[in-house]
From Swiss-Prot:
TM helices/strands, residue ranges: none
The HD domain, residue ranges: 72-285
Name of the protein described by the UniProt record: Deoxyguanosinetriphosphate triphosphohydrolase-like protein
Alphabetical list of Pfam families matching this protein: HD, HD_assoc
Region (Disordered), start-end ranges: 22-41
Domain of life: Bacteria
Basic and acidic residues: compositionally biased ranges: 24-41
MF (Gene Ontology): dGTPase activity
Gene3D superfamilies: Hypothetical protein af1432
Source organism: Haemophilus influenzae (strain PittGG)
Length: 461
């Protein structure tokens, strides 16, 4: 934001509105249950079937190829640890320095005002535990395959499925999912827009739809980011305590679509979500690099370009440490590599700071966490290296292709005779659903499978 766009900041201590602890359904604690609301949310997520299923879902590599690889479950646990560390760091005075200069307000005053906004450990861990539970089997390949099959019924995307599981599918209640607090749900919404609006406009593109899943140009069907239109009722409830101005601003896209093949991305997210997303990015960039090194997917020669890029970044810490970090990353001594990984994670965590987003009335939207510009560039180098040498690795891509082919074929088979081939409960839901939502029932069933379960079902068919 420009300084001339900033409205006057009221320096009274901020108090979180009680509506953020409301649930969609009345849900008083059980007798003698004195847990605060976000601890109850954490327990529901931690004990859910959707969370347990993460132990058998791919982070990047196929489950069973190597026991060292992280699954989405171990990844989520590490994201929670980093998220809690970021929250602790954001309490320190130094993290208010940049915001103090932006607002021309003493950083001590900002610290007093804004610290109460920070999520509790229960809340940030809830978000980090939940952030990946909507991802289907076989990672982004599975996600794109399901989007291809659902393109005419609102599409499919992992973050949208996460919101759907939390608010509808997980059987803690009959029709409201886990019935989590409003603030927890706000924290998992990375992209506050409808998926069928944010995604490429497939009806205008006329992409070929090959009935044989082996020959689908799957790259054409990468989804945008958002919420399913089927879940609009819960999304509207989530935002109903915001002012009209805040709702409109919160759901804005970064730009206007220039061609139908373009995906649109929203501009804003909540404070809690920004912390969770930073934790996810740090875990992705650093821990997935560790997986790749340990299992021999990458070597020091491939790392040289990234090493050179990191040395060009105007960071005193990187200039002083990146040579030894790079050497220790590829050391034969496991403890040296572990020390290097720990040093990198600490570098990113200790460079977090407060940021003003826009003139929101709601303080949970007005402020975000961010990394300083040079540290953002550094994290981007790590993420790009993982993308280039791990995700785009031919073995990874073949596993992903195999997975997307299996999911596409399974979807077609289930759709051809659902009452015969779907499990009884799923078949009953399919039978009772209106015509326009029947495919969503099949999609929910497939998306909820682990990699191993999907493989077993495919082999049965």
């Amino acid at each position: 934001m420009q300084k001339n766009e900033i409205k006057q900041i009221d320096m009274k201590p901020l108090i979180i509105d009680s509506s953020w602890t409301e649930r969609f359904l009345p849900d008083p604690p059980r007798e003698k249950d004195n847990r605060p609301p976000f601890r109850r949310d954490r327990g529901r997520i931690l004990h859910s079937a959707a969370f347990r299923c993460l132990q058998a879902k791919t982070q990047i590599h196929s489950i069973g190829e190597n026991d060292f690889y992280r699954t989405r479950l171990t990844h989520s646990l590490e994201v929670a640890q980093i998220g809690s560390s970021l929250v602790a760091q954001l309490k320190f005075l130094e993290t208010f320095e940049s915001l103090s200069q932006t607002l021309n307000i003493d950083k001590n005053e900002l610290q007093k005002q804004l610290k109460p906004l920070l999520p509790s450990n229960d809340l940030i861990e809830s978000l980090c535990f939940a952030h990946d539970i909507g991802h289907p089997p076989f990672g982004h390949g599975g996600e794109t395959a399901l989007n291809y099959m659902m393109a005419e019924q609102g599409g499919f995307e992992g973050n949208a499925q996460t919101f759907r599981i939390l608010t509808k599918l997980e059987p803690y209640t009959e029709n409201a999912g886990m019935n989590l607090t409003r603030r927890t749900l706000l924290g998992v919404v990375k992209y506050p827009a409808l998926l069928d609006v944010a995604s490429p406009q497939y009806a205008e593109l006329n992409f070929s739809r090959n009935i044989d899943a082996r020959f689908v140009r799957i790259h054409d069907w990468i989804p945008g980011k958002g919420i399913f239109r089927d879940d609009l009722k819960m999304f509207n409830w989530l935002l109903e305590n915001l002012s009209e101005n805040d709702r409109t601003l919160f759901c804005q896209f970064k730009k206007v679509r220039e061609n139908p093949a373009e995906s649109l991305h929203t501009r804003f997210k909540s404070l809690d979500c920004s912390i969770m997303e930073l934790a996810d990015d740090i875990a992705y960039g650093v821990h997935d690099l560790e997986d790749a090194i340990v299992t021999g997917m990458v070597n020091p020669h491939q790392w040289q370009a990234a090493h050179s890029a990191l040395k060009q970044i105007p960071s005193a810490w990187l200039h002083e440490n990146i040579d030894s970090i790079s050497q220790r990353l590829f050391s034969d001594k496991h403890f040296e590599r572990k020390q290097a990984i720990g040093a990198l994670v600490n570098f990113f965590i200790t460079n977090v700071r407060w940021k003003l987003t826009a003139n929101f009335d709601e303080p949970l939207l007005r402020y975000n966490a961010e990394l300083s510009p040079e540290v953002i560039v550094a994290l981007g180098v790590f993420k790009k290296f993982v993308w280039d040498y791990v995700i785009r690795n031919v073995d990874t891509q073949r596993i992903e292709y195999k997975g997307q082919r299996m999911l596409t074929e399974m979807f077609q088979i289930f759709e051809s005779d659902p009452e015969r081939l779907l499990p009884r409960n799923t078949a009953n839901r399919w039978r009772n659903a209106p015509e326009e939502r029947k495919k969503r029932i099949i999609c929910d069933y497939i998306a909820g499978m682990s990699d191993a379960h999907a493989l077993r079902v495919y082999q049965q068919l």
